[in-house]
Amino acid sequence: MALSQMMQQYLEVKDKYKDALIFYRLGDFYEMFFDDAVTASKELDLTLTGRDCGLSERAPMCGVPYHAVDTYIAKLLAKGYKVVICEQMTKPGDQKGLVVRKVVREVTPGTRIDSVMLDGDKNNYLMSAYLSDDGKAGVSWTDISTGEFQNLLIDSQLNLKLNEILSRVSPAEIICNSKMKVRSNQLSLVRYGGIYKFSQYSDDAFSYDNAFEKVKAVLKNFSMFDGKPECVCSAGALLDYIEKTQKRTLKHIKSGEFDDAEQYMTIDANARRTLELMSSSGGKTSGSLIKIIDNTSTSMGARMLKKWLEKPSLDIGEINRRLDAV
């Protein structure tokens, strides 16, 4: 027995996105099949059914209504899954043969934009980390919902500073080159905390020539990367990943900044936990410092206050400006 044409089409998509759950549009539903269906039914508490697929056994299947899809995707992202949206491009009956379908978006923990999937009071960062042959690292991170794009060069105390930036930025997703993937296993927040996972991305995207072309095409102030090739590599790969997952260039990401570590107090991961800045000892927001002092009126204000707590300024002038604003 042979697979049906529709199921062949589905498996062609799945073959290109092996590490993601495929949401495959069928009429008013997004359906999942085979292993994806088993996983989604468990994680989303959906009924697992079956569908004739041309084989001797029915293909495991489950689905969600298209109008509520963002809610289900948000639940999967919160558990670390990636989701690929495969949309119908033609209507049944409009033409002979199989309905044309196309992947229109990849949604990952660090690339969510829709308000349903986001907590407006906190940033949702996607991070890129590159390790060079001589042990220097470029780290770039962005919140694609706001356009913020930060960069940092690490040329000493690599493990210590990587742990610090992870605990401060708290990225939802991290991509890296192959060398950084190996090195990440030495980080305490990876080995013992189990909090962060580095996902290896294409080394070609991290190559200097490819990364520089991407940075030059997107960031207006690309000259700020002069003398910092490691950051060119991390920033270029980050922009490449965004374009790949979103299937477009995000025009509101126009310029970048460098994270100036000399202007703020460095707080390591252990100190952050002890001080209970963002969460209490039980891992909950209630009882934390941010929960007690956050009386902001807007999501933008809440995000700003959170940054101020995570990066206490050492600049007297800046500290006084913040106090005067209260």
Give residue ranges: language-model regions.
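Charged catalytic and DNA/RNA-contacting regions of genome-maintenance
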Residues: 1-326
